[in-house]
C-alpha cells in the first residue's frame, strides 16, 4: 500500500500522476524539484474557486467587500490550520536544517504546501475536481459564505483613517533577521506629522505590518483599533 494513500483519502482525490503529489509535498530546502511552481499555480486556482463561490453566494456584495471576504478565507493562518487538519504536515519533505528547526509546524510552509496540492490536483484532474476537493476541505465555512462579514484589516483601516483627515499615508520600515529558513520580520509604522511609532514582529512581513498598523490605530484618539483583526487579509 502506497504511504500516500491515507493522505489522498483525506484530500478526497486519488492522483493519476502520483509524482505531482510528491512534488507538492517537497519544500525547497529538500531539493531543486520542489513545490514552489505548484504553489504559484495553486494560489491562483484557490483564489479563483473561493472568488467564484463568493460571487454566486453574495450577489449584493460590492467588489471591495468580496475581495476582503476572499482574503479572510485564503490567508496564511486559515490555510495552515486546514493543512494541519488534513494531516499534510505528516508527509512534508524538508531539508535537514528545516526539519530540525520545526519546519513541519511552520505556518508559511504548511500554507504553501496546501496551495501546492491545490495546483497539483488542478493539473492532475482539472478545475471541477479541484473545486470539489477545496469546497469539501472548507466544509461548513463554505455554507457560511453567505453570512461572512467583510471585515477590514488593520492596514486598510489605518489608511482610510488617514485619508479621511488628509494626512500622509503610513510608512512601514522593515528589518529582517535570522536565517533564510527561519526569518523574523520587525516592522516599524509611523506617519509623518504624527508622534506615534509602533512595532510589529512576526515570521511573515505582511502579518508584522498588520500588527504594527493595529497598534498604531489603538494609539489614535478615537479608539479606531478596537475590534479589528491583525490577520493577513
From Swiss-Prot:
GO terms for biological process: mRNA processing; regulation of gene expression; rRNA processing; tRNA processing. It catalyses: Endonucleolytic cleavage to 5'-phosphomonoester. GO terms for cellular component: cytoplasm. Digests double-stranded RNA. Involved in the processing of primary rRNA transcript to yield the immediate precursors to the large and small rRNAs (23S and 16S). Processes some mRNAs, and tRNAs when they are encoded in the rRNA operon. Processes pre-crRNA and tracrRNA of type II CRISPR loci if present in the organism. Its EC number is 3.1.26.3. HAMAP family: RNase_III. This is Ribonuclease 3. Mg(2+) binds at residues 39, 112, 115. Belongs to the ribonuclease III family. Residues 153-222 form the DRBM domain. The keyword Magnesium applies.
Amino acid at each position: 500500500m502506497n504511504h500516500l494513500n491515507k493522505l489522498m483519502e483525506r484530500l478526497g482525490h486519488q492522483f493519476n500522476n502520483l509524482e505531482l503529489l510528491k512534488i507538492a509535498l517537497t519544500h525547497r530546502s529538500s531539493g531543486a524539484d520542489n513545490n514552489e511552481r505548484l504553489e504559484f499555480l495553486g494560489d491562483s486556482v484557490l483564489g479563483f474557486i473561493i472568488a467564484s463561490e463568493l460571487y454566486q453566494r453574495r450577489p449584493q456584495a460590492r467588489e471591495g467587500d468580496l475581495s476582503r471576504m476572499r482574503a479572510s478565507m485564503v490567508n496564511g493562518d486559515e490555510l495552515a490550520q486546514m493543512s494541519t487538519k488534513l494531516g499534510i504536515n505528516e508527509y512534508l519533505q524538508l531539508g535537514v536544517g528545516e526539519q530540525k528547526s520545526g519546519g513541519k509546524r511552520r505556518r508559511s510552509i504548511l500554507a504553501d504546501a496546501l496551495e501546492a496540492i491545490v495546483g497539483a490536483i488542478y493539473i492532475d484532474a482539472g478545475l471541477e475536481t479541484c473545486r470539489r476537493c477545496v469546497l469539501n476541505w472548507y466544509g461548513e465555512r463554505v455554507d457560511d459564505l453567505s453570512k461572512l462579514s467583510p471585515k477590514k484589516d488593520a492596514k486598510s483601516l489605518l489608511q482610510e483613517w488617514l485619508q479621511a483627515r488628509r494626512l500622509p499615508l503610513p510608512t512601514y520600515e522593515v528589518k529582517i533577521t535570522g536565517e533564510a529558513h527561519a526569518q523574523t520580520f520587525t516592522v516599524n509604522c509611523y506617519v509623518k506629522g504624527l508622534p506615534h511609532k509602533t512595532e510589529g514582529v512576526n515570521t511573515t512581513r505582511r502579518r508584522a505590518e498588520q500588527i504594527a498598523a493595529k497598534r498604531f490605530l489603538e494609539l489614535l484618539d478615537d479608539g479606531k483599533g478596537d475590534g479589528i483583526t491583525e490577520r493577513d487579509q
